Amino acid sequence: MKFYLVNGTFREDMPKGPAFQEALKAHHAYWAPHMQAGKVLFSGPKTSGAGLLILKCSGAEEVQKLIDEDPFVTGGVAVFEASEFSAFYKFPAAEQWFAAE
């Protein structure tokens, strides 16, 4: 397995109001099963807008597919960029997540 930092940025032309709220609900619902499956270590909003995720996937193609199908992307709310990284220093409680295949 490989590890990815996924950085999201809101689009300047993103929907506002109720359309944004609907996209947000869909975005949360989309990532919930991936969290349950162990693909997501954490995710959350940045104070500057949009958010970050740490993912564990088989490779760049899987990460890109997850990003492309995110309702924030399909709904024109945000763009995401994934960067692969190696986990060298790890908090002991997170060791199991990083070690699992």
What are these regions (language model features)?
Residues 1-101:
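Conserved, structured core segments of small domains
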